[in-house]
Amino acid sequence: MKKTAKVFSAALAATVALSNVSALACTGLYVGKEASADGTTIIARSEDISPSDYQKVHKVVPHVENQPGRVLEDINGFQMPLPATTYQYTMMSDYSTAGDGVYPAVCSNEMGVSVTGTVSASPCAAWKEADPYVENGLREAVLPAAVACCSATAKEGVENLLKIVDEYGSAEGNIVMIADQNEAWIVEIYGGHQYAAMKMPADAVAVYGNQFMIGLVDPAATEGYIFSDELFSTIDELGLAVKEDGKYHLAKSITDETRSDGNNMRTWIGHKVLAPSSVGAYDSDTFYDLFYTPDEKVTLDDVMGIYRNRYEGTEYDADLPGNEGMRAIAVSTTPETHIVQIHDDYPTQSAAVTWVAPGGAEHSVFLPELSGITDTADAWKTDSAIYTDNSVYWTFKQICGLADTDRTLYTQGVEDYWTLQEAMMQAEMEQVGEQAKTLYAQDEAKGDAYVTALAEEMVEEQMANAEHLYAELLTVVTHNNGLSSGKTPVTFEATTALREAAQFKGYTVGWNAADGAITLTKGSDKISLKAGSATAVKNGQEVELSAAPYTQNGVTYVPMSFVQGL
């Protein structure tokens, strides 16, 4: 989560000056493989950047074989020699003229290692003075790439990261997660040189805001922990130690037992969603546990839902009058949200399925790709500070921009549309995984080509869906904006392509060319409807639709409420 940056667009030079960019509300999430419904390990994070017109560019950094003399560098003066050979990895970087560095955000490499970083966090004032940041030290701007380019395992990724902090220092307080098919780690960098790393339990989950989270640890622990040499002595010398049965509570000690509601509340709501039985009402003074057991196995839908959460169902609902200042997980300033699912039974180079919601999860869709991709769609590589056609980011962000204007009227309709698309993509990805395993077993190049083409096809399909959704949403927003005083605004409901939605729900779709009647059959159920008529017939009974179906370019569209009722 970047703290400050400069944004400049030459095209807008006459009207827009350099503007500060700040990050407010990145949220990290972890689901251990024994806690997930499908046995995958999940690490996830939302980026947060303000202002919110901040394009992300998705690309693949190729494998480099035996080319010594290269360096990894950052605009703050950080320079680190690279190994002669570096691994291929994916990344989700800032647009090139953003002015504050690369910010790879989330990387998965050919060795099956994935890293997401960072969630920024701050220690107390006394700690900052004792362990000051290093001005030209390691920043989030290059951190994920520094790990992904040269780490063959998650553990090696942790060790490489900590060696960098030891040698070059850190310019920021950061939280990072690194995972592979065998294990997952969390790393907390507290200042210029002090840190703690912990292997995350496979049977637990975690959701956290911008605050250090590692709790009670034994300073003598070696299995599953790595501590900087002077971590505990620094805590003791500053008189900050908070102990229990001889163990140090790192989060309480490093922060001098302080929490910010804007961060702590996001940690609490994650716990409340995944394990309501073990957490009560929100309490500002509570240091919520980093890890806990979920009440039920966690699904991918659960994780997506958390990243769309705005404290609905609580008194802190960010959309209620008086709660406008609440720092929810889902915010308008999110340029992308990513969820990395690591499959133990997938080929190493494609072990991770990364789901990316361009423009933020609340009003966008999660697009999947396997980590073995060797290239990304051209629309992912569009690099511009201002709106441009054929851009993944802008295609989805324009929907977010409209829906954000009135969540009461527009959010549910947008989320309903994307939830259906995500359900269909999840079903497809189950088949894709099996096909990928078969192809990789035959030939690695075949496997790579397959997953690359598939990712590009899914991007193209969902961009087309986004354009359809945007057109409908823009129509309703424009209608509502022009209403006379006292008129009731329209609540948005999207339409979706009937054939693919009905087939996904298990229906056979027939069409009568003579009268244009469309028939859906599933077992004993039979539904008949026509474009232009808001009345359908289900098993002999008339049913009123919320709007009449319509046909455009040979595709019949029906209201989402009709599909939800199938």
Label every PLM stretch briefly.
Residues 1-9:
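Bacterial N-terminal signal peptides that target proteins for export
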Residues 316-442:
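Substrate-recognition/cap regions that form aromatic- and gly/pro-loop-enriched pockets
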Residues 12, 16-20:
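Hydrophobic core
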Residues 21-25:
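Sec/Tat signal peptide C-region and signal peptidase I cleavage site
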Residues 414-487:
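Histidine-centered catalytic/metal-binding microenvironments
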Residues 129-134, 142-151, 491, 548-553:
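Second-shell loop/turn segments in exported
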Residues 476-566:
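Primary recognition of N-terminal secretory signal peptides and signal-anchoring hydrophobic helices
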Residues 26-140, 160-285, 289-290:
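A contiguous strand-loop segment
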